[in-house]
UniProtKB/Swiss-Prot annotation:
Known function: Component of the biogenesis of lysosome-related organelles complex-1 (BLOC-1) involved in endosomal cargo sorting.
Protein name in the entry: Biogenesis of lysosome-related organelles complex 1 subunit VAB2
Coiled coil residues, start to end: 70-135
Origin species: Eremothecium gossypii (strain ATCC 10895 / CBS 109.51 / FGSC 9923 / NRRL Y-1056) (Yeast)
Subunit structure: Component of the biogenesis of lysosome-related organelles complex-1 (BLOC-1) composed of at least BLI1, BLS1, CNL1, KXD1, SNN1 and VAB2.
Length: 325
């Protein structure tokens, strides 16, 4: 054992004397002595080991329990949130499905109703067309009959012609008979009948008073001036198939005539209040004129003695109300 000796080995020849070094004096022994004492066998048992690390084991158990509780709580929260979202999704799915079914039912219902209404509308349009054709046939038959009846009358008593039937008083009949019997009518004319009437039958201008014969002004200014129209406008308004435009034109002519008469009455009433309250009012020729009624000429216009004026066209009552006010 080399660690029991110090010094170098010498050959036997050279080693005459040996020096003994003790174990306690060696460095290895010193290192061995510096080590701790070995525990006893009792201390190396399992229960002894767990008793030695009991605090550490307890802390580890507590940490594991805390981690487990936190993980379980988080999992429970996530589970509740997932269930809540699932319930909302189911409710939304039910609503969407309900709305979709309702929309499909409404679409089918409205589609059925629309198809039924379209069929009814087609039937109504067909009925209208058949009625229009029947009306055209009836009108043509009536015109033929009237023409045959008129041909049976003496020459002087016949009504179909420019001398009896004119475009101003009978626009629709004039157009019908002129198209059916063009030989009995002259060339198409505009409504220029007013040009043949005396100038005194129409007022000079709205708001302009006459300083001459006041009685002549009272009679003349109460006549409604007719609307002058050329042949193009006349054809537009008085075409037999254009009844709506004819109604608008009649309404416009009536409103214009009533406005002119009211302004004329205000002018004449301011100059002669006493005379205007007792004077008889002449009826404008366009106010009470029906569509197929012949109206007398302005020289023989009817008065309040032989005709009854309705309330919407009673200019006399309006004049009395203004004077009494």
């Amino acid at each position: 054992m080399s660690f029991l000796f110090s010094g170098e080995l010498r050959s036997p020849k050279n080693a005459s004397t040996e020096r003994f070094v003790s174990v306690r004096g060696s460095d290895a022994y010193k290192e061995l002595c510096s080590l701790g004492m070995l525990p006893s066998s009792k201390d190396l048992r399992q229960d002894s080991i767990f008793r030695a690390v009991a605090n550490e084991v307890k802390q580890v158990k507590q940490d594991v329990v805390e981690i487990n509780s936190r993980v379980v709580a988080e999992v429970q929260v996530e589970k509740e949130l997932a269930e809540h979202l699932n319930q909302k999704l189911k409710a939304s799915e039910y609503k969407v499905d309900h709305l979709a079914k309702k929309l499909v039912r409404l679409r089918q219902k409205h589609s059925t109703n629309t198809q039924r209404q379209v069929r009814k509308l087609d039937d109504c349009i067909g009925d209208f067309e058949s009625n229009i054709r029947e009306l055209h046939g009836t009108v043509a038959e009536m015109v033929d009959r009237l023409g045959s009846v008129d041909m049976g009358l003496p020459e002087k008593e016949r009504l179909i012609g420019d001398h009896q039937l004119n475009a101003r008083h009978y626009p629709l009949l004039y157009e019908l008979f002129r198209d059916k019997f063009p030989s009995k009518f002259g060339a198409p004319r505009g409504l220029g009948i007013a040009s043949s009437l005396p100038e005194r039958a129409f007022p000079k201008a709205l708001g302009e008073s006459d300083t001459g014969d006041l009685s002549h002004h009272d009679v003349a200014t109460r006549e409604a001036p007719p609307l002058e129209m050329d042949s193009a406008e006349e054809g537009c308004f008085y075409h037999p198939q254009n009844l709506a435009v004819d109604h608008i034109r009649n309404h416009f002519m009536n409103s214009r005539s009533s406005d002119i008469n009211e302004r004329e009455l205000e002018i004449s009433g301011s100059a002669h209040a006493t005379k205007a309250s007792s004077a008889r009012e002449n009826i404008p020729e366009r106010i009470l004129m029906p569509q197929f009624q012949k109206v007398a000429s302005p020289q023989t216009a009817p008065t309040l003695e032989n005709i009854e004026v309705t309330v919407p066209f009673s200019s006399k009552s309006a004049g009395h109300e203004r004077h009494s006010g």
